[in-house]
Amino acid sequence: MGRRFVDQRRADPYYRAAQREGLRSRAAFKLAYLDDRFHLFRPGARVLDLGAAPGGWSLIALDRAGPTGTVVAVDPRPIAPTEGLRVVRGRVGDPALRERLGSRSFDVVLSDMSPSISGAYATDHARSVDLVRSALELALRVLAPRGAFVAKVFAGDLVDELVLEVRPHFAEVVRTKPPASRAPSSELYVVARGFRPNAPRRERPVSPEAARPDSDI
């Protein structure tokens, strides 16, 4: 880790705030913003957090869903245990994950997943889109009616097509970039609310650039 990176991180107000408040990552502020703006969580909400490590989003969801809420965090990497948080070790694309989740349904499905960065932006963008498609495929199976889906994606020419794939299944779909996202970052979030379980499903396309996703998730 270079000195320049360390200095930039220390100068980051969201990083400092996360350290001060004992949060697991600065990404927690992104989800807090999205909930404040779009009212994702209600008391007692059932939340599925995909690509959850180190757990920053899961803890925000746990706090906002309240003591009667349920949060299931999914990641192949370890997540520190927290009272009320159920951790499932697994990968989103693994068919066994659906079996491990059982028959439960969720009010909110979150995905802050990122691909392994190759350094070729077109490839990284396409892989991020494919991760959203994997998360969406699972969300369509487990979301309760009127539920919400939130997913990170890297900006690029495939995002419009991705939004068109999401839109038939939800009453509202928007794109946004939280203030806590770093200015140079290409990340944005697709926020979909009002899940329609009976909407017809399209066959999932595969981006040629993402033929080998090589994801961390």
Regions inferred by a protein language model and the residue ranges of each:
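Class I S-adenosyl-L-methionine
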Residues: 155-217
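Class I SAM-dependent methyltransferase Rossmann-like catalytic core
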Residues: 1-43
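Short glycine-dipeptide loop
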Residues: 67-68, 142-148
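Conserved SAM-binding loop of SAM-dependent methyltransferases across substrates and taxa
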Residues: 54-66
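S-adenosyl-L-methionine
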Residues: 74-118
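A short glycine-rich, Lys/Arg-flanked "PGG" loop and its adjoining helix->strand segment in the class I
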Residues: 129-145
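Glycine/threonine-rich flexible loop motifs
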Residues: 117-129
